[in-house]
Amino acid sequence: MEKKISPNLTLFALAINAFAIGSTEFISVGLLPMIVKSFHISLSQAGLTVSLYALGVTIGAPLLTILTGKWNRRSLMLGIMLLFISGNLIAAFAPTFIILLVGRILSALAHGIFMSVSTVIAADVVPPSRRASAIAIMFTGLTVATVTGVPLGTFIGQQTAWHMSFLFIASIVLVGLIASYFLVPKNLPIPGKVDLKGITRIFTNKPLVFSFLITAFGYGGTFAAYTYLSPLLENLGFSANAVVIILVVYGVMVAIGNTVGGHWANKKPLDSLVKMFSLLILSLVFLFITVLMDNSLLGLLASLMLGLFAFMNVPGLQLYVVELAEKYVPEDITLASAFNIAAFNIGITVGSMTGGVVTDHLSVTYTPIFGGFIVLIAVLFVLYIRKQEEQKNNYL
């Protein structure tokens, strides 16, 4: 008989893994200038380390969730972390830029399925009344990664070489792997095979399809600018060390924004999204103007404002999809959530690639304003859906 493991210890192991995952996703943002110099490539090419990673998560979340439905959850978690370590080691020792991208994509595939599996494990190890809190504890690893992991990884890369940043993350994942081996129970429920008909049910449901589009454009617009935040700040005259400190404060602003956004989205997520997207657009426009003016003080303020509003919409976007899934496809809530994770990362891909194109054809200075245009598309989708709902309610 397996010795009972404290749920808090299991959640601690998941939080360590989430910290490593969160650090890896955005570590390239701080390392872009170093990667450009190391491989003698353009800034937009270096941006592929962000956009292709997001594409890997997009594929990994739904596809691997479907393929591994019958696997033991603990064994799957250990396999995910081994894949994640492999991807970071390949990136760390990459002799060419192509090999670096291969390492990033492998890590991204692990990231995609981790988000689905870890949420289920967190919910399974606690009583039903504590499930939301358990998932929140696990996700604190991602928040802490934004505040400390990315800046620390960037600092390590600046003081040594960018390769060491990926070794740093691989070492954290190794700790998470060991913790998972001892602290994740062996006898967790196995969800079973995913009903592929659920895909049809989800993508023939108009509100859900529009919710994915809102997620992709509303979340993704930020990344046209955020992907290139380090060179933007350096263009404003900030040193490499100053950029690290700014990224730490940026992460704190993200954490505050997430908390505020969660409170705003509790009652009417759709209405709150219009407000949060509008604030995000204003912050992107402000950043564009300050960079154009070459004003370092206002540019710093605009960057921190972007941190506050950039990810404020995440709780609302997640809640809106869950509410729609509960209403229209209650048997496919897990799959709908996986597709929303994919939508988040499609947004990152679209945003970061747009930033790359803008950087190549105009200048990195113009990335924030194009990000604002992408978010504006999400606002139009929200207004359309809200109008549809009002008309439907009037007929009832």
Annotate each PLM feature.
Residues 170-189, 382-385:
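C-terminal membrane-cytosol helix-exit motif in multi-pass small-molecule transporters
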Residues 59-98:
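Conserved MFS/SLC helix-loop-helix module at the cytosolic interface between two early adjacent transmembrane helices
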Residues 61-72, 258-269, 359:
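Helix-to-loop junctions at the C-terminal end of transmembrane segments
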Residues 324-362:
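A late C-terminal transmembrane helix in Major Facilitator Superfamily
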Residues 97, 103-141:
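Cytoplasmic helix-loop-helix junction between adjacent transmembrane helices
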Residues 83-90, 95-107, 297-305:
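Paired small-residue
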